[in-house]
């Protein structure tokens, strides 16, 4: 994938960049693998805002992605197409299994149309194949990693991300996650070989406010621009200082306060915390 630039014939075009979509081979999604996606506007079932600055955006269909490839062990599939997915930063690959089933997976970097992929402990170590972590050699780059066996892929799913196998310790495999965190994950957890494709996603510049609105993002208002009733930083005459340690809209200390529970059971699996 490459990034496409524009001549600055308007102010918003000056720095705007878009993906060139050269890797996309099919424009319409597979009908059997899509379902409606209802917008919430950041509201919960009571109609109250639970996530601020969400709303609007282009209508989307949800593409059903296979994050549990262990239920097709030993069944080869051919990569039929690489498609765009509006619901994630990565591209998706349409697989045609030899038993007739079709599924979407996250498209790893280097996956080609016509290539054959397979899942299972005996699968060869090549891009797009899924195996339990204990069967993957140390140093291999993987993505779509399960945190618990049979629970579906949770880690390293965004564009350009990957985890690397650093070593083994009993039943567990030590992974370096995209954040830099070193973590133990059970060896029976499945992962897919390779890094997620569309690595240039991080170089996309929206260029104008309207493009954020197309994505369903509303303006992010600073607390200092609000009234005192709306935010701890609000109020004052003109540009007033905060007058207190920085706080969230709900009064929690922010800017550096650790929010992870001290006695969280999964902490025993974290060898080294993420890099700041």
UniProtKB/Swiss-Prot annotation:
Cross-referenced InterPro entries: NA-bd_OB-fold, Rib_uL2_dom2, Ribosomal_uL2, Ribosomal_uL2_bac/org-type, Ribosomal_uL2_C, Ribosomal_uL2_CS, Ribosomal_uL2_dom3, Ribosomal_uL2_RNA-bd_dom
Similarity remark: Belongs to the universal ribosomal protein uL2 family.
Entry keyword set: Ribonucleoprotein, Ribosomal protein, RNA-binding, rRNA-binding
Quaternary structure note: Part of the 50S ribosomal subunit. Forms a bridge to the 30S subunit in the 70S ribosome.
Protein name per the record: Large ribosomal subunit protein uL2
Origin organism lineage: Bacteria, Thermotogati, Deinococcota, Deinococci, Thermales
HAMAP family noted in UniProt: Ribosomal_uL2_B
Gene Ontology cellular-component terms listed: large ribosomal subunit
Name of a matching Pfam family: Ribosomal_L2
Basic residues bias (residue ranges): 257-276
Stated role: One of the primary rRNA binding proteins. Required for association of the 30S and 50S subunits to form the 70S ribosome, for tRNA binding and peptide bond formation. It has been suggested to have peptidyltransferase activity; this is somewhat controversial. Makes several contacts with the 16S rRNA in the 70S ribosome.
Listed NCBIfam families: rplB_bact
Amino acid composition bias (Basic and acidic residues), ranges on this chain: 230-240
Region called Disordered, residue ranges: 223-276
Example of a GO MF term: rRNA binding
One of the protein's GO biological processes: cytoplasmic translation
